Amino acid sequence: MRMRLAYKLALLTLLVAGGAVVMLAWLASTNASRLLEQEALVRLKENVNQGSIAFERSFETVKGDLSLLKHTPALGGVIRAIQGGGYDDQLNETRTGWEHRLQEVFRTVMQQRSYYSQVRLIGLQEGGRELVRLDRVGGSIEVVPAERLQQKGQRPYLQQAAMLAEEAIYFSEVTLNRERGRIVVPWEPMLRLATPVFDPQSGAVFGVLVLNIHFDRFTRPLRQKVLEDSFYLLANGRGEYLIHPQSEKRFSFEIEEREESLLLDYPQMDLQAELEHWRERDELDHEHSSTRQLKGQGVGVTLRPFYFDPLHPERYLILGTVASSQVLEQQAAGFRQQLALLVLLVV
């Protein structure tokens, strides 16, 4: 009788212990799944933050190049020669001679940066006529001859840059390049930076120096830093795609009867409110990012604003990484299987 009671007590103890182990294993599995999800989102966020740092360096490089070009002696020589009726009395050089020197400076900079598609000096006289212009055509860099130089006086980048202070820089929207009003095919997404150039003698605005940046080439290093089973995206401040692996989603604002954006693709994130918050740019809010696991869509998404225009601090681009939940779910399932096996061995 006592032996039977002992067996029953032992069996009861075993069942209680086994149940406790199973419960603990279940709780551990659940918590582990949540931790894995959180860890994946942290990795997404870190990836976007690293991309933002790299992007900032690229912008600093471009701004440095623009400043270098602006202060090159050849540019001052061109200005003096034009103001002197074709001859620079100060250094005894013709306008043509100075223009050749400036062309070589432009060429050197373009050779160092594959994403520069065009470098120009534009004067304000004669309707904003181009004075010196180099284009990247295929694999070569070409000087545009005088008869092909154009008037750009009505272009917003020229008008707005001409009104800036000496060291200020105008940043355009990222748009598709057009020739004679038509979008160039294949597409050439362009970002234009422009800064005013002043007559050293009178102090008046003489013209504008303009860099045309091929945006796809400019962002190539950024897109190469993407995590496994994820992709980078880049959008303007309205959430419209500039960079996306699905080409049909890009630059929908340039194409009639097409609408593609972050707001439409990820409605669960309530991005309209987020965009307004980022536009206000609360300096006390150092987070400036939005990270969500969208289980209904099977993805994790991290977005953050990239502020690039000191003259207009409300302007930003949106950097983002989107990752599939499939790998995360596989990792969680494998962990649960290991726990289940451990429970069986213990019990």
Where are these regions (language model features)?
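Non-catalytic regulatory/interaction regions at protein termini and inter-domain linkers
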Residues: 1-6, 35-38, 289-291, 325-330
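Juxtamembrane extracytoplasmic/periplasmic/luminal helical "stalk" adjacent to the first N-terminal
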Residues: 5-10, 16-94, 111-115, 189-190
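Conserved beta-strands of PAS-like sensory domains
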Residues: 183-226, 231, 237, 242-246, ...
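Extracellular/periplasmic juxtamembrane segments that couple receptor/chemosensory ectodomains to their
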Residues: 260-338
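Selective detector of the "anchor" transmembrane alpha-helix that sits immediately C-terminal
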Residues: 338-347
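Short N-terminal helix-loop-first-beta-strand/juxtamembrane motif that initiates sensory/input modules
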Residues: 61-76, 108-136, 163-170, 223-249, ...
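A short, polar/charged loop-to-alpha-helix boundary motif
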Residues: 141-149, 216-224, 249-263
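Extracytoplasmic/periplasmic ligand-binding sensor regions of membrane-associated signaling proteins
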Residues: 111-112, 134-213
